[in-house]
């Protein structure tokens, strides 16, 4: 029996929000909304081939993210490549939306994490913690909290 390398397995984070799919889609694809819960993006368009970037400072290090939208199915799915300037590795982040009445289940899948440098900064547990906070806390608060739009 072969043991699968945990690092090579897709990272999946799922959450259900008290918001309709149209509202969640807008939060995932409108740059002005994304800046409020995601990252400080200069530009973003939900169009296949659109390239965007952003910089994150964490623990005294700077991480320059380079991304390219690869797939868009309005109100259902958006995917983009995710890599770091000057570092080896390529990954793919996919957001999928599933309507559940007036609620929406979001499934985030991040594949290719194992292609990044084998250093603590790029450890799978850091990606798990980051996506859990972004989707489970920041996006949830944005969609359901006191600043949420109807």
Where are these regions (language model features)?
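Hydrophobic pocket/interface hotspot
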Residues: 24, 34, 52-54, 69, ...
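Residue-level signal for tight coil/turn positions that link beta-strands
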Residues: 8, 21, 49, 73-76, ...
């Amino acid at each position: 029996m072969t043991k699968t390398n945990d690092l090579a397995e897709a990272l999946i984070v799922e959450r259900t929000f008290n918001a309709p799919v149209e509202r969640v889609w807008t939060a995932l694809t409108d740059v002005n909304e994304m800046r409020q819960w995601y990252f400080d993006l200069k530009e973003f368009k939900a169009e296949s081939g659109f390239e965007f970037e952003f910089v994150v400072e964490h623990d005294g290090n700077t991480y320059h993210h380079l991304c390219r939208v690869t797939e868009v199915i309005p109100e259902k799915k958006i995917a983009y490549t995710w890599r770091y300037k000057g570092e080896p590795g390529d990954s793919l982040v996919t957001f999928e939306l599933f309507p559940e009445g007036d609620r929406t289940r979001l499934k985030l899948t991040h594949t290719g994490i194992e292609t990044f440098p084998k250093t603590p900064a790029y450890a799978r547990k850091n990606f798990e913690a980051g996506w859990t906070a972004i989707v489970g806390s920041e996006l949830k608060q944005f969609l359901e909290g006191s600043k949420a739009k109807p």
